[in-house]
């Protein structure tokens, strides 16, 4: 899990989903899990 300022490039990857949990924005990617990130 990485913490990134901008998730725009990650959400364009194939298989990416943008999820809000507890007021934070996450990108989860089941096809390619190394693209998991939280916006910070």
Swiss-Prot record:
This is Large ribosomal subunit protein bL36. The lineage of its organism: Bacteria, Bacillati, Actinomycetota, Actinomycetes, Mycobacteriales. Belongs to the bacterial ribosomal protein bL36 family. It comes from Corynebacterium urealyticum (strain ATCC 43042 / DSM 7109). The gene is rpmJ. GO terms for molecular function: structural constituent of ribosome. Pfam families: Ribosomal_L36. One of its GO terms (cellular component) is ribonucleoprotein complex. Coiled coil: none annotated. GO terms for biological process: translation. HAMAP family: Ribosomal_bL36.
